[in-house]
From Swiss-Prot:
This is Coiled-coil domain-containing protein 177. Residues 364-605 form a coiled coil. The lineage of its organism: Eukaryota, Metazoa, Chordata, Craniata, Vertebrata. The keyword Membrane does not apply. Residues 1-65, 183-294, 372-426, 454-581, 597-637, 652-707 are annotated as: Disordered. It comes from Homo sapiens. The gene is CCDC177. Residues 377-392, 399-426, 454-484, 491-514, 543-581, 618-637, 652-664, 677-707 have a biased composition (Basic and acidic residues).
Length: 707
């Protein structure tokens, strides 16, 4: 997490000058125990410290700022706040990395590993051997963690002692000599005095290729940080009580020194986020091996640009440059804002010199750590091979023991199976005998049942044949009787058909005669023609017909009478309705005439009243128009006089502003010339590179790395 910093403070940084005291370690929750750490220092500093040209901070907001450095800061204690709980990103303190470097321990070796990872690395191991290796690894990891925590406490005590103890003159002279030798060493290389030397990683990679185990532990190369974050002395003194909280950062760091040695140093890269670390070993520092703090006395202190730019030496240096510019150019005083910019430029130059010293010490320490790491890897490989051989022998002994036990169990099982087989054979023979007896009994019983069934079937067959014979005889007799009845019925039908044909012919003749003589005579002839078969029914039908005819005649007469009565009533109703309609129309005509007369009278009255109102409104409008015209003329006169007065005031104000602007422009030009000469003087003394030059150097380094 990053402290919020105003834009004015961010604008005061030159490219590559935001120093870093923190490294960000990304530890995913599902990859605890993995040997490949995530890329560090990529999320906190890469986005916060982008190189850009210097922008002057606002002098008016200078009084309300914090007492810390004006640059962007990383908070060493922000993982104690509630907002950081459950975050995947943990800030790793540089003290933790320094403690790991002193103890020759890689921070990734302090991470816990799962038992499944050890089993996955060596599929041939048994679970007992893997469990033993896991317990040994955990014990070694806890010992290393305790050792690194103790070393970190010792580093914190040394830093506190240095913070409150001024440097001796001898130490100051040694630091100045180292600062003087660093630029000369840097200028002999292909880059400028402020650029970094190339890392010896390619040479180390050509000397010894990594073993399979070490290749697994090497993390992917982390992206170089574009800026440096410095923890100010004031913030450190205020928060020294909560320094113990960074132990979690040491245990969750994903830092690896070998991955950084495999990269070339980009220009102005941080020296704090590339602290060397050894491989997995719990040995402490050798008595003759120098640490980073013993090589360079100043590396134990944590500086920021705010600390360097507010120091008395920087203030005296800036004052001397200002006096020199006044004497040479004869200009007026330099503003406080430009003085702060000059002090910041000098502080950056001092910080670069300090970082050069730290890098030189780190490169020497890295070379020594590489040799020790190679020896430790070889020793660990031998120990792993020895443990693997022991595991194989134990596994072979267990296999032999299991094989003998399995043979005994198989022989015992064979004997049990033999006894069971013999018992089953006896039971099978007894069962076979019983089944044979049962089969013979069933066969005899089935034979008896078959004989009885055959006898019964023969009897049933005889009875069925006799029944069939009787049925055939009865059927033949019935068929003959049916044929006789059919013949008689056919004869009767033929006689009936002939009679019907004769009757039909007579009926046709009678119908033809009835058409000529009339319906009454036709009905009488039909009754005479059908009297042989329908005499009784025809009489009733005739009676019914006569009754129906009479009833129909009566109904027709009644209906005709009702229709005539309804016709007379409808005619009377129509005449009455016509008379009523005629009277209604006459009444409507009279009412319409009355309404028309009333409407004509009302319209005439409305026209007269409207004419009177129009005349009155015209007179009122004429009076209002004359009053408005007089008012507009008066307003125009007032506005014209006010406009003339305002134009006069504006002309006077414009002349005054022109005079003030001319004087302010002259003053600003004089101040700008003084500020320019002060900055040029500071650049000449510090030989600071420009942003374009840094871009060209970065492109050159990138092309050399690709080659």
């Amino acid at each position: 997490m990053v402290d919020p910093v105003p834009e004015e403070e961010k604008a005061g940084a030159e490219p590559g000058d935001s120093g870093g005291d923190e490294a960000v370690a990304s530890v995913p929750p599902d990859s605890q125990g993995a040997q490949e750490p995530a890329a560090s220092s990529a999320s906190a500093s890469a986005s916060a410290a982008v190189p850009r040209k210097a922008e002057v901070p606002c002098a008016a907001a200078e009084g309300g700022r914090r007492e810390q450095s004006p640059l962007l800061h990383l908070d060493l204690f922000n993982f104690d706040c509630p907002e950081a709980e459950g975050s995947r990103y943990v800030l790793t303190s540089p003290r933790s990395l320094e403690a790991c470097a002193r103890c020759a321990v890689k921070p990734v070796e302090l991470l816990p590993r799962a038992l499944a990872d050890l089993v996955r690395e060596a599929p041939g191991r048994s679970m007992r051997v893997a469990t033993g290796l896991y317990e040994a690894y955990e014990a070694e990891r806890r010992a290393k963690l305790q050792q690194c925590r103790a070393e970190r406490e010792r580093i914190m005590r040394e830093e506190k002692r240095r913070l409150f103890t001024p440097l001796s003159p001898a130490a100051a002279a040694a630091a100045a000599a180292a600062a003087a030798s660093a630029p000369s060493a840097g200028s002999s290389s292909s880059c400028s005095s402020a650029s970094l030397p190339a890392s010896p990683a390619p040479r180390a990679a050509r000397k010894a290729s990594p073993s399979p185990s070490s290749a697994r532990t090497q993390p992917p190369p982390a992206g170089s940080r574009t800026g440096r974050k410095s923890h100010s002395l004031d913030s450190l003194s205020r928060r020294r009580e909560g320094a113990l909280s960074s132990e979690s950062g040491a245990s969750s760091s994903s830092y690896s020194g070998e991955s950084l040695r495999e990269l070339r140093w980009p220009p102005r890269a941080s020296a704090r986020n590339s602290c060397p670390a050894g491989s997995a070993s719990s040995t402490t520092n050798a008595p003759g091996r120098p640490s980073a703090l013993t090589l360079v006395p100043i590396t134990g202190r944590s500086f920021s640009l705010g600390d360097l730019s507010h120091s008395p030496q920087t203030a005296q240096h800036v004052e001397r440059i200002v006096r020199q510019v006044r004497a040479e150019r004869g200009l007026r005083g330099v503003p406080e804002r430009d003085r702060k910019i000059a002090a910041l430029m000098l502080a950056r130059h001092q910080e670069e010199l300090l970082l050069l010293e730290q890098r030189a010490a780190a490169h020497g320490q890295w070379e020594l750590q590489r040799v020790h790491a190679k020896q430790r890897r070889e020793r660990e490989e031998r120990e792993k091979q020895r443990a693997l051989e022991q595991g194989r022998r134990a596994w072979a002994a267990q296999v032999e023991e299991r094989r003998g036990r399995r043979g005994r169990e198989e022989r015992e099982a064979a004997r049990r199976r033999q006894r069971q087989y013999e018992r089953s054979e006896e039971r099978r023979r007894e069962l076979a005998e019983r089944q044979g007896l049962l089969r013979r009994e069933r066969a005899e019983r089935a034979a008896r049942e078959d004989r009885l069934r055959k006898l019964q079937q023969e009897q049933n067959l005889k009875q069925r044949e006799e029944g069939l014979q009787e049925g055939r005889e009865r059927a033949e007799q019935i068929r003959r009787e049916r044929a006789q009845r059919a013949a008689r019925a056919k004869q009767r039908q033929e006689g009936q058909l002939q009679r019907e044909k004769r009757e039909l012919s007579r009926a046709e003749r009678a119908r033809h005669e009835a058409l000529l003589q009339g319906r009454t005579r036709q009905q009488r002839q039909e009754r005479e023609g059908l009297r042989s078969s329908l005499e009784a029914s025809l009489g009733r039908a005739q009676e019914n017909y006569e009754h129906l005819v009479e009833q129909r005649t009566r109904e027709l007469r009644e209906r005709a009478r009702r229709e005539e009565l309804q016709g007379r009533r409808a005619k009377e109703a129509a005449e009455r309705k016509e008379r009523e309609h005629q009277a209604h129309l006459e009444a409507l005509a009279r009412a319409g005439e009355r309404r028309l007369q009333h409407a004509t009278q009302v319209a005439e009255e409305a026209v007269q009243q409207k004419a009177r109102r129009v005349g009155q409104s015209r007179l009122e409008k004429e009076r209002a128009q004359r009053a408005n015209k007089e008012k507009v003329e008066r307003d125009e006169d007032c506005r014209r006089r006010e406009l003339l007065q305002a134009i006069g005031r504006k002309l006077e104000r414009s002349e005054q502003l022109t005079r003030e602007r001319r004087s302010a422009l002259e003053s600003a030009r004089s101040t700008a010339r003084a500020s320019f000469h002060v900055r040029e003087k500071v650049r000449e003394e510090t030989n600071t590179r420009s942003f374009d030059r840094m871009v060209r150097e970065a492109q050159l380094h990138a092309s050399l790395d690709r080659k």
